Swiss-Prot record:
Protein name, entry field: Flagellar hook-basal body complex protein FliE
Annotated InterPro entries: FliE (IPR001624)
UniProt source species: Bacillus subtilis (strain 168)
Biased composition (Low complexity): 9-27
Top-rank taxon: Bacteria
Annotated spans, Disordered: 1-36
Cell compartments where the protein resides: Bacterial flagellum basal body
GO MF term (any one): structural molecule activity
Annotated family: Belongs to the FliE family.
Keyword Transmembrane helix: no
Gene Ontology cellular-component terms listed: bacterial-type flagellum basal body
GO aspect biological process, one term: bacterial-type flagellum assembly
Amino acid sequence: MINAISPFQVQNTQNTQNATNQVNNSQKTDSSNQTSFSELLKNSISSLNESQVASDNMTNALAAGKDVNLDEVMIAAQKASISLTAATEFRNKAVEAYQEIMRMQM
């Protein structure tokens, strides 16, 4: 038995083809814009350092009696603390993964 092709099936086929083309195009652009792991790590460490320095500067200004909003100082300190905790956890996971690889038998 032969079924007729409905207009909805044609539209679905065209939508699927368009989506496939978009995925292929985005994969091509993503591969050309990728940054290396070392650059990503360097940028992350730089950002972490900047947040730590900003927090220290605000804390020192507050301790020196300068006109600094306590809320902003506490928020900056918490952001720096969370960033440092995340970086420490990332380092721990990286070391753990390295140790696991070193335990593998060849």
